[in-house]
Amino acid sequence: MGNLLVVIAVALFIAAIVVLVVAIRRPKTPATPGGRRDPLAFDAMPQFGPRQLGPGAIVSHGGIDYVVRGSVTFREGPFVWWEHLLEGGDTPTWLSVQEDDGRLELAMWVKRTDLGLQPGGQHVIDGVTFQETERGHAGYTTEGTTGLPAGGEMDYVDCASAGQGADESMLLSFERWAPDMGWEIATGKSVLAGELTVYPAPPVSA
């Protein structure tokens, strides 16, 4: 019996050595390195995606925590952008989110009911001169509380600060939600993604 145990022990020892040798000699498959990603790519910042920023999300900016009450999705041809109604400051604020040439563009907007302007030409507001940069016609859909219908079409005119030494972060916007309606005016300021902290919206109920 003792000899049998010795034989079994020797056999197991030899088998272990064989397995070890095979494992050492087996060529290792090099791991395929993952490609490095653009840190500024739109999809590299999921906190600003349409699924994360929506009714119920929290946006922290400038020491103020805002709640997203509603969202508007705009579509013009292949282009899509969003505006989110924020509640939490002294006045309702809108956060616009869009992608331009792979860069994420964000801006905070305040409606200006005190201005009776029409699109076209230059406008001087609060000491800043604005010049038209773009205009168009887009379809839109809404979610949550926005003060707008569930969907429709609208016209827009975008302006930016003009002149030598102008602050390029200052913005002006005209929006019209029906041909027989007046223009809504808003002034805005560009913000960087790093200036915002976003706590995503709860998932959409099935």
UniProtKB/Swiss-Prot annotation:
The chain crosses the membrane at residues 4-24. This is Uncharacterized protein Mb2628. One of its GO terms (cellular component) is membrane. Pfam families: DUF4178. Keywords: Membrane, Transmembrane, Transmembrane helix. It is a single-pass membrane protein. It is found in: Membrane.
